[in-house]
Amino acid sequence: MPTEPETDYDPELGRKFIFVTGGVMSGLGKGITAASTGRLLKNAGFDVTAVKIDPYLNVDAGTMNPFQHGEVYVLKDGGEVDLDLGNYERFLDIDMTFDHNVTTGKTYQHVIEKERSGDYLGRTVQIIPHITDDIKRRIREAAEGNDVCIIEVGGTVGDIEGMPYLEALRQFAHEEDEDDILFTHVTLVPYSKNGEQKTKPTQHSVKELRSIGLQPDILVGRCSDKLDIDTKEKIALFCDVPTEAVFSNPDVDDIYHVPLMVEEEGLDQYVMEELDIATEALPEDERENRWRDLVTQNTEGEVDIALVGKYDLEDAYMSVHEALKHAGLEKNVDVNVQWVNSEKMNDHHADRMREADAIVVPGGFGARGTEGKIEAIRYARENDIPFLGLCLGFQMAVVEYARNVLDLDDAHSAELDEDTPHPVIDILPEQYEIEDMGGTMRLGAHETEIDANTLAATLYGGESCTERHRHRYEVNPEYIDDLEAAGLKFSGYAENRMEILELAPEDHPYFIGTQFHPEFRSRPTRASPPFVGLLEAVLGDDPHTVTTEEVSH
């Protein structure tokens, strides 16, 4: 269940459910529409959570290729999930759990296990009712303790994979009070060559949805510009909804502006009225405005960051991008992320690194592109360029230091080179006997102890931090003494595991790496300390002396 320091949950309201479906094509932005709705409801004083339904047969997203699917987002309990849950955590400022991600693989696995154990007492196990009942159970359990639960159904209406979920939603609406259920459908409204907004794709999508037994209460048109009134009226007429239930969600440069745009259209007020909770909302002058203040502030400069990785898909590093953006919001600067392909570290990419104010090497798996990452780290270290290494970036910083400072030319990670004579990065002891790939790494939130009077202690404002992990390998203890004697300080650790490295301020203005993924806990209103410190170093402030009040998590 999502947890926060304080909750506004009012059991007298009962639970409200908002289901968000999509039509015409995938990738329309259902998740951002749903998250923006949740953000506005939270601003109005309601306790909000979310559920993402992914109709694939994978149990989780842990074994999916980031190049095809985008990043694997890690939750505090170790759940490896779709990147949309990252958007929900960032927009709603909550911590979610693996129970908030429903996949076909997880649902079928659970039902089959129950059948094998005899729980169904010899009955024929079918999609209806057994699979649909399990889907409904998962939604209700995830919603416990919240006023509103927003459920996003992945994929597009009409996809065969999604049919059991839409049937479960139809049953769900039949079982709950009418005032407790709201269906939002997000569709594409394209322009014709003559500049006319076309409604036919939306009409057909709603027709498909209605054929399943679902009637949308709200329609959100994804478009390059706002829907004009004629378009809204036409959609309302043919889709059988009031004109005031048709909303625009036009393209924007920054997704954090979407809540403000749909608020201007009155989406939040309409939702509250339909769910019969408008009278329970905070007065407008008492609602949370920090989000608006942050995303509409006038910036006072810009910073260029080189992100050195091997995946061409921007979504593969979404949380890193967002964490850099959050740090920019805190320091009141625009952050321009320059992509540097670590597989093609030629003169062109070297020039891009030289032009950058800082270098970030993110996480990843596999040998492809690692030599380019090592070269980028060497360049940052030798030229006093502020540097942040994350997970694999942390490990490659150890490899780079071993090679170029300790003169261990063949040093490497045992994950990437099984025959290396100097495995400065080696497999975690508990991983030796594990054969399965999915869900078997060191995952989720773990506490790291931090040495006093270090850069890490200054950034985190104390002698410990709790961040999320996703790795099988760690620094080889046999090399720690030699590395530290040569100037590489391991300032954060969990028992005998090294989890933060840094260089002393007299050796480098800002050089830090983390075995964990601080980007997964970064929020627009609470930026991640290592990312804030990176910008501090670029802007000329000494992150080694920044106070806790200036950089807080």
From Swiss-Prot:
Disulfide bonds: none annotated. UTP binds at residues 26, 198-203, 234. Mg(2+) binds at residues 84, 152. Keywords: ATP-binding, Cytoplasm, Glutamine amidotransferase, Ligase, Magnesium, Metal-binding, Nucleotide-binding, Pyrimidine biosynthesis. Pathway: Pyrimidine metabolism; CTP biosynthesis via de novo pathway; CTP from UDP: step 2/2. The active site is at 391 (nucleophile), 517, 519. It is an enzyme of class 6 (ligase). Residues 307-544 form the Glutamine amidotransferase type-1 domain. GO terms for cellular component: cytoophidium; cytoplasm. It catalyses: UTP + L-glutamine + ATP + H2O = CTP + L-glutamate + ADP + phosphate + 2 H(+); L-glutamine + H2O = L-glutamate + NH4(+); UTP + NH4(+) + ATP = CTP + ADP + phosphate + 2 H(+). ATP binds at residues 27-32, 84, 252. Its EC number is 6.3.4.2. CTP binds at residues 26, 159-161, 198-203, 234. Pfam families: CTP_synth_N, GATase. GO terms for biological process: 'de novo' CTP biosynthetic process; pyrimidine nucleobase biosynthetic process. It comes from the Archaea. Its main location: cytoplasm. It is found in: Cytoplasm. Residues 1-277 are annotated as: Amidoligase domain. Catalyzes the ATP-dependent amination of UTP to CTP with either L-glutamine or ammonia as the source of nitrogen. Regulates intracellular CTP levels through interactions with the four ribonucleotide triphosphates. CTPSs have evolved a hybrid strategy for distinguishing between UTP and CTP. The overlapping regions of the product feedback inhibitory and substrate sites recognize a common feature in both compounds, the triphosphate moiety. To differentiate isosteric substrate and product pyrimidine rings, an additional pocket far from the expected kinase/ligase catalytic site, specifically recognizes the cytosine and ribose portions of the product inhibitor. This is CTP synthase. It comes from Haloarcula hispanica (strain ATCC 33960 / DSM 4426 / JCM 8911 / NBRC 102182 / NCIMB 2187 / VKM B-1755). The gene is pyrG.
